[in-house]
A protein has these predicted regions:
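Short beta-strand segments
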Residues: 63-65, 143-145, 168-171, 205-209
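Boundary of Sec targeting at the N-terminus
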Residues: 20-22, 27, 31-33
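ATP/NTP phosphate-donor binding region
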Residues: 34-131
Length: 270
């Protein structure tokens, strides 16, 4: 029988993993089962890996932080919901067809509204990506994030991530329980972009409502419309059509490997 992404990633949450490890008091940071394996990053985050990864597909790590894309509320409604309710596996499973274009590894960094994202979360994201980027089996990264501070997080990561591999941020304006929720398509397009060779070396990008924006330039321009982001001064970088990127612009500012910023030894910002 086919194994869904939720079964691969969501069946065992990071909380359950850590509890199991504490109970067993195991000195081994890597464990396996018939369907999945997982290991810990240096910061203690659990990376869940399907044992059914396809060798002919690129591999994308999805780092979930919460936000509206993981929100839940009254069925059909786009307001009065609680952010950060769904875990990373459930999010990936909602993006129909995504396992046909990439192997997905799930990492639950936190599960909060973006107003509650801290500089410690920023540093954890940067250092986790920098660590995992050394794995030749991982081709790109996607971060799911709340929209209120997504542009701030993308700016920070654009300066502190040290890899040429694609790093894509996305979110949603409607919670998962809303009619025509926008999160699944945003996530699908983001994973497709992160898995694409054309996206290498372009810095941190934001994908929203099929648009591709530079992490340094993107701004939130609406609190209600699904087309909620734009790059007013420099313009967008491109757009997505059914998982295929079309670029017409590039980042002109120093980013990622070109910057002098190093947060590897920090736990909080000065």
């Amino acid at each position: 029988a086919a194994i869904t992404a939720a079964a691969m990633i969501s069946t065992i949450t990071p909380t359950m993993i850590f509890a199991q490890e504490q109970e067993e008091k195991s000195e081994n940071s890597s464990q396996t089962s018939d369907e999945y394996s997982f290991y810990e990053t240096k910061s203690g985050l659990s990376v869940t890996v399907s044992n059914n990864e396809k060798e002919d597909l690129p591999t994308v790590a999805v780092l979930a932080t919460g936000g509206t894309i993981a929100g839940s509320g009254t069925a059909g409604k786009a307001t009065n919901y609680t952010a950060g309710q769904l875990d990373v596996g459930t999010l990936v499973d909602s993006a129909a067809g995504v396992t046909d274009i990439a192997n997905v590894r799930g990492i639950q960094v936190c599960n909060v509204g973006s107003d509650d994202i801290t500089d410690e979360n920023w540093i954890t994201l940067a250092n986790t990506i920098n660590e995992l980027a050394q794995d030749e089996n991982i081709d790109g990264f996607v971060i799911t994030h709340g929209t209120d501070t997504l542009d701030e997080s993308s700016y920070f990561l654009n300066l502190t991530v040290k890899t040429d591999k694609p790093v894509v941020m996305t979110g949603a304006m409607r919670p998962s329980t809303a009619t025509s929720a926008d999160g699944p398509m945003n996530l699908y397009q983001s994973i497709a972009l992160a898995a694409n060779e054309q996206a290498k070396g372009k810095g941190v990008m934001v994908v929203f409502s099929d648009g591709i924006y530079g992490g340094r330039d993107v701004q939130k321009i609406s609190t209600c419309q699904t087309d909620a982001f734009d790059s007013k001064d420099f313009g967008g970088m491109g757009y997505m059509v059914d998982g295929v990127p079309y670029f017409y612009n590039d980042s002109v500012k120093c980013h990622t490997t070109e910057t002098e910023f190093d947060v590897s030894s920090l736990k909080e910002l000065p």
